[in-house]
């Protein structure tokens, strides 16, 4: 879909404002834990207290989201003998395929986030999967390719073809470390030139390239994202992607995490990094693939920037942050994605607290639902303002003479509703969600 210009005319009397693919702006959330909450019948309600029967459909139709992100672990049961129920480590391939299909059926874009680990991968943990630990470096490179290819093939077959693929999660310091963060010798350092440790940079970029090769083969229309979290350090970000370019890593989009309490202020650190990256790599769009803000308890440690004076740790402060973030990102035409991390957080799970229905042990207090009454916070409704979808209902109107159904990309699917696959369509100027 790269640089695809949509030219389909939907019907007689159709009024369109069709956008080029590179004008698309994605907005949504990483909803990786939603099915686990649903499994324990956790209620989701709108601001007025009305029940939301399906949050994925609600996101597409009411929140105006056009994309969702889902993480994928290799074998989460290895580190979680209770089948990974606690702490959110449940996202194996079968789980992700089912959730990915729901996202696609709702008419949204699907961002797949490969962790290449059995557990959380982030700047301090890039633990090699248990089943891969005995592999030689040559075998590991091959497994990076075959595993990525196998997963993507399974998702395509399940009707959950990813539109965007992250090769790793927050891989600022590399990936697939042998050993712990303290003793591994596999790290790369984003502020350093590759010349300081060429062996590690070559290992790391070869892994990335093998993952990217699998994406190009199985999902040729998907765009590849390289995701880091050094957003407070513009110099490190520029150096890092310069190192990747030296090794000819194949990717399309720069992905950043932006949590203001770790990565700096909306008025300084974030714009400085966005401008520096665009100035150095003008051919690479940028997406904020993770963001969030506290709605309640403010941690007593682990915080780099105290932003409470501007944005209190309250639902109103969270809402104000999201409103300002959307406004700020709209200033940069080279930023084309915004994902809220874990918006579905809704207490420990279940309608009321019960030790048998615990999805997570601890509340992060960054979700977009009140964990006590399960009502949506105002911030839930902010994110969709960033979205711009080609041929969206906001840009399409048809008259009653056109009986055809159209995808959100303007493709006619015919007039026989019974023959349509599940998904979100435009029919006579309205969004219609069809289920099977």
Predicted regions and their residues:
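C-terminal tail/sorting-segment detector
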Residues: 424-436
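Residue-level detector of functionally pivotal "anchor" positions at catalytic/ligand-binding pockets or at interdomain
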Residues: 388-409
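Aromatic-rich peripheral "rim/lid" segments of glycoside hydrolase catalytic domains that contact
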Residues: 182, 276, 283, 296-324, ...
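Glycoside hydrolase catalytic-domain groove-lining segments
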Residues: 53-59, 202, 217-224, 231-306, ...
